[in-house]
Amino acid sequence: MKKYEIMYILRPNLDNNEVKKINDHLESVFSKKPSTILEKKEIGLKDLAYPINNHKKGYYYWFITQTDNEAVLEFNRIVKITEEVIRFIIIKE
């Protein structure tokens, strides 16, 4: 299993319940596979460096996971079809 650093940004117009629901859904991808979330941080609502889809702010989330490639591919697929995610990045350490 390899380590991956993942960060994603959610739309700023979501309420706390929606944000929690989306985070739980995205993290559940790794609980279904043999993986471990080593570290995670809810950075919160921050200004974006430039507007994305007419949004100037976003909810930032970051975590490091140790998992297999299959779980990362599934996360990538899900995050691409989740409308609330406006930007994400996955880095293999």
From Swiss-Prot:
Protein's UniProt keywords contain Ribonucleoprotein: yes
GO terms under cellular component: cytoplasm; ribonucleoprotein complex; ribosome
BP terms from Gene Ontology: translation
Keywords of the record: Ribonucleoprotein, Ribosomal protein, RNA-binding, rRNA-binding
Alphabetical list of InterPro entries matching this protein: Ribosomal_bS6, Ribosomal_bS6_CS, Ribosomal_bS6_sf, Ribosomal_S6_plastid/chlpt, Transl_elong_EF1B/ribsomal_bS6
Entry keyword rRNA-binding: yes
Molecular function terms from GO: small ribosomal subunit rRNA binding; structural constituent of ribosome
Family: Belongs to the bacterial ribosomal protein bS6 family.
Entry function: Binds together with bS18 to 16S ribosomal RNA.
HAMAP family according to UniProt: Ribosomal_bS6 (MF_00360)
Protein name: Small ribosomal subunit protein bS6
Gene: rpsF
